[in-house]
Regions:
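N-terminal Rossmann NAD(P)H-binding glycine-rich loop of SDR-like oxidoreductase domains
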Residues: 1-26
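Structural signature of beta-strand start/N-cap positions in the alpha/beta core
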Residues: 2, 38, 63-65, 107, ...
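SDR active-site strand-loop-helix element
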Residues: 6, 42, 67-71, 108-113, ...
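Intrinsically disordered, low-complexity Ser/Thr- and acidic-rich flexible linkers and loops
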Residues: 24-36
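Rossmann-fold cofactor-recognition segment
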Residues: 38-53
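NAD(P)H-binding glycine-rich loop region in Rossmannoid oxidoreductase-like domains
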Residues: 49-89, 100
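Catalytic helix-loop patch of NAD(P)-dependent Rossmann-fold dehydrogenases
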Residues: 88, 92-96, 103, 107, ...
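Conserved small/polar residues in nucleotide/adenosyl-binding loops
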Residues: 161-167
Length: 167
């Protein structure tokens, strides 16, 4: 099995790669079929996920079974002033990965954020699949666009995960 992890230099990408390579996580063992996976960590400048041609070429060349997208523009305040950069990383990037995954048959695991929710439901506590998104920041809005693109372009093999605060 071959797994590409985008955003490998970030906090989440670094931890996912570590756990895949060690074969264990804080919540339990890694599934056996992932134990001996070839893990391909990738980040800027090697792969700019906002560049469709670069993504398409890279994914076709690598032929992964799984793509775990941890890449994002995560500076919440920065997203308010750098709309273009936020849109490229958080919306176009996931779209490009979704299209490439769909073309090659790879499974896409797209990591999003609880910022796609307003925090006003349930007293701002638990969000679940039934919670209606309602971002209140540019960061949340661009991450929600990325989720929508993944849903639109990756029909066969996708999984979306929301993270909260990372420690």
């Amino acid at each position: 099995m071959k797994i590409i992890v985008t955003g490998c230099k970030g906090q989440l990408g670094t931890e996912i790669i570590k756990q895949l390579r060690e074969g264990r996580s804080e919540i339990g063992p890694i599934p056996e079929k992932l134990m001996n996976a070839t893990v391909i960590p990738v980040d800027l400048p090697e792969l700019d996920i906002s560049n469709y041609k670069m993504v398409d070429d890279f994914i076709r060349r690598q032929r992964p079974d799984v793509i775990i997208n941890c890449a994002a523009y995560t500076n919440v305040d920065g997203c308010e002033v750098n709309h273009d950069a936020a849109f490229k990383a958080n919306a176009l990037g996931p779209r490009n990965l979704a299209q490439a995954a769909e073309k090659t048959g790879a499974r896409l695991v797209h990591v999003s954020t609880d910022y796609v929710f307003s925090g006003r439901e349930n007293g701002g506590i638990a969000q679940d699949e039934a919670t209606i998104p309602g971002p209140i920041s540019a960061y949340g809005s661009t991450k929600l666009m990325g989720e929508k693109y993944v849903e639109q372009f990756c029909h066969r093999h996708r999984s979306e995960e929301h993270t909260s605060e990372l420690q």
